[in-house]
Amino acid sequence: MGEEHPRKRSRQHFEAEARNVSLFESPQCETSKWYFSREEIERFSPSRKDGIDLVKESFLRSSYCTFLQRLGMKLHVSQVTISCAMVMCHRFYMRQSHAKNDWQTIATSSLFLACKAEDEPCQLSSVVVASYEIIYEWDPSASIRIHQTECYHEFKEIILSGESLLLSTSAFHLDIELPYKPLAAALNRLNAWPDLATAAWNFVHDWIRTTLCLQYKPHVIATATVHLAATFQNAKVGSRRDWWLEFGVTTKLLKEVIQEMCTLIEVDRRRNMPPPPPPPRRELSWAIPAAVKPVHMARAYPFHSYPLQSYRQAGIW
């Protein structure tokens, strides 16, 4: 029997999972360490120990980020708060396993907690109702059911249990630094033109959804993002060739981060590329085919305008 779609699980199944909050793992790692190597993330996460492979965990990460974006927009909270919740989830699942912690519960609790951390209060009742409606959007009666007293209080307790687990797992460390402030400072200091700034902001929004924020500090991500956006825009930034040194980023580190970013872009490009068309049906023909002239086609990027090969050109540094 195939795997059940996460959005179509029964209400009873979801609630039964969350009632077992006491079965959630206790933090086993050093909570003061919030940055990890790529090897730690890909090979030694708690989920990996429970048999969840990298592809599955990446899918779950994408799922809770998409869910958080939808939930945040439904509640009209800022993008900073939504991004803060995403990072909370990233950190949580470097301490706890997806196998034992439902991502919809953790994501909902993360957004509620992020609203508090970012001084953007949001009523718990609003979070509960909005989350339930998104989770069970396939069920026409969900919007009515969540307003019933018993269902509402049961789901509210689930979210509060998730919040308690998030707090204990993070050792109450809620001061999350995002790349937005250092990016704004860098763009202002370098007098970046509007198109470059827009590209950089869009990149940062994408990086928040990945493990990049678990590998590098915000000012490093911001600096590398400006360099990447400038390269794609063929724009010159800064008055000196190695302007990134002014932001405390070495050339070696910059190259390392940009390589990670290019890998993420390439993975995203392949994921969004449609499957190749089936080969044309061959029909028998006794006619002698005429000579065909060679056709030279220019390489194009129909799905992404990210010329990754530009980083292989000489003299880019």
From Swiss-Prot:
GO BP annotation list: cell division; regulation of transcription by RNA polymerase II
Classification via Pfam families: Cyclin_N (PF00134), CycT2-like_C (PF21797)
InterPro entries: Cyclin-like_dom, Cyclin-like_sf, Cyclin/Ssn8, Cyclin_N
Tissue specificity statement from the Swiss-Prot or TrEMBL entry: Abundantly expressed in flowers. Expressed in roots, seedlings, rosettes and stems.
A GO cellular-component term linked to this record: nucleus
Gene3D superfamilies the UniProt entry points to: Cyclin-like
GO-annotated molecular function: cyclin-dependent protein serine/threonine kinase regulator activity
SUPFAM superfamilies registered for this protein in UniProt: Cyclin-like
Keywords: Cell cycle, Cell division, Cyclin
SMART domains linked to this entry: CYCLIN
UniProt key word Cell cycle: yes
Assembly: Interacts with CDKC-1 and CDKC-2.
Family label: Belongs to the cyclin family. Cyclin T subfamily.
The protein, known as: Cyclin-T1-3
Organism: Arabidopsis thaliana (Mouse-ear cress)
